[in-house]
Amino acid sequence: MQGACVLLLLGLHLQLSLGLVPVEEEDPAFWNRQAAQALDVAKKLQPIQTAAKNVILFLGDGMGVPTVTATRILKGQMNGKLGPETPLAMDQFPYVALSKTYNVDRQVPDSAGTATAYLCGVKGNYRTIGVSAAARYNQCKTTRGNEVTSVMNRAKKAGKSVGVVTTTRVQHASPAGAYAHTVNRNWYSDADLPADAQMNGCQDIAAQLVNNMDIDVILGGGRKYMFPVGTPDPEYPDDASVNGVRKRKQNLVQAWQAKHQGAQYVWNRTALLQAADDSSVTHLMGLFEPADMKYNVQQDHTKDPTLQEMTEVALRVVSRNPRGFYLFVEGGRIDHGHHDDKAYMALTEAGMFDNAIAKANELTSELDTLILVTADHSHVFSFGGYTLRGTSIFGLAPSKALDSKSYTSILYGNGPGYALGGGSRPDVNDSTSEDPSYQQQAAVPQASETHGGEDVAVFARGPQAHLVHGVEEETFVAHIMAFAGCVEPYTDCNLPAPTTATSIPDAAHLAASPPPLALLAGAMLLLLAPTLY
């Protein structure tokens, strides 16, 4: 797959770098007409003042505004456009705001403290999840009495179905904010708990996934944290490094299945799609990798579901509840690509995340379903260099730097892409910069690139989406969801019920639908074949 991606990107570079700006854009009437149309839409925009039967929160981990813009360019170019003019699915939501992401104790946050903010409505400390700032990192004794409750938990208490979907392990910081309370985000299994934490009764995150609340749908990675130590992985039985890790010999999947008569566990795409059409399935757990799921471009799409597919399956299951649902969907590996200074991985993950948003938007009605899209934090990721419009987002700036060497438009402030260890910066060319495994250069050496501290965007559509406005604390996201859904502490919301009900269509087409990115790559390669040879 990686070789095909290289050819695809090189082909895009050939096609786009030779492209011309559309002639109509030279005419002022083009821009005036476009703005007038946008103004007309804005004037007709009316808030939907009913309650939200359903709430979906899409969380792009590390998807700061620069990442959103770069993803827009990439998706536009992959569809044969120049790039920046082509809207993402999230761009088309009518309400947008900015969210302040700091933790109580950190100006630049991590994904644990931020998850507490946007999922529970309370800011917490760095590396802690589901607890107030009175709890201290790694101090188990400070957990009890400082737990805070997620909106997902409150939605479940209100009778709604709930689900968690992620491309990371389901025990990772962001999804854990929906169900766990821990003073250390890395306590994935009991093997990670220090002796004092075990002695003081702290539970690992995987155990809390099963024990803390009734979650109807759980989809992502993280198999090894659920099974007893030494249990062979079903997909990689000969690789002992991914065996189960639980020291107390607990099989948490079996424990979860025993709680629900209609519970089904799956670990591959085929079984997932079959479960989607089985009306007897009331609870669905799909764990598709021992730890985090693979990057989309590295997946075997006959075995590994895409985020779009997982989102659609989750929607089919939770939408069976006449009282509605709450669904958390995370594009978690956007963040991991950035931490590695690998922009290709980050941006293609963000593109797939946007595809999942588009699918949810298609399957649900804005009259009864509130959809929010946001990020937990940003990254020290930027793109510049006065590149020509239509230049590949992974391409080079048109002029050289003061050291007479080329540089990529995308650069990082720090991270493993630091390249001055030999005393001078290495040169880079188009072939190198378009390689999916290429690490963009970074100014400061770090084993892992750091988060950025700037505000992130919040996009919204549906009932009460108009409350997304201005610049707010990240905690406001949770309170909008709680108010729109009329769950604690807003059970007296006094909002009328929606008049239209979302109805998810049959999922039989899922098994036959090729993954969007693979399909797109294949189509583009066919189109570009004459220029490549």
UniProtKB/Swiss-Prot annotation:
Residues holding Zn(2+) 1: 61, 111, 376-377
Disulfide bonds: 140-202, 486-493
GO biological process entries: dephosphorylation
Active site annotation, chain numbering: 111 (phosphoserine intermediate)
Stated name of the protein: Intestinal-type alkaline phosphatase
Keyword set, alphabetical order: Calcium, Cell membrane, Disulfide bond, Glycoprotein, GPI-anchor, Hydrolase, Lipoprotein, Magnesium, Membrane, Metal-binding, Signal, Zinc
A Pfam family reported for this protein in Swiss-Prot or TrEMBL: Alk_phosphatase
Lipidation (GPI-anchor amidated aspartate): 506
Entry membrane topology: Lipid-anchor; GPI-anchor
Residue sites binding Zn(2+) 2 per the record: 335, 339, 451
Cofactor mode of binding and number, as noted: Binds 1 Mg(2+) ion. Binds 2 Zn(2+) ions.
One GO cellular component term noted in the UniProt record for this chain: plasma membrane
Localization annotation: Cell membrane
TM segment ranges: none
Binding site for Mg(2+): 61, 174, 330
Assembly and interaction partners: Homodimer.
Organism: Bos taurus (Bovine)
One annotated GO molecular function: zinc ion binding
Homology family: Belongs to the alkaline phosphatase family.
EC numbers for this chain: 3.1.3.1
Role of this protein: Alkaline phosphatase that can hydrolyze various phosphate compounds.
SUPFAM superfamilies listed in its UniProt record: Alkaline phosphatase-like (SSF53649)
Note: In most mammals there are four different isozymes: placental (ALPP), germ cell (ALPG), intestinal (ALPI) and tissue non-specific (liver/bone/kidney) (ALPL/TNAP).
Catalysis performed (reactions): a phosphate monoester + H2O = an alcohol + phosphate
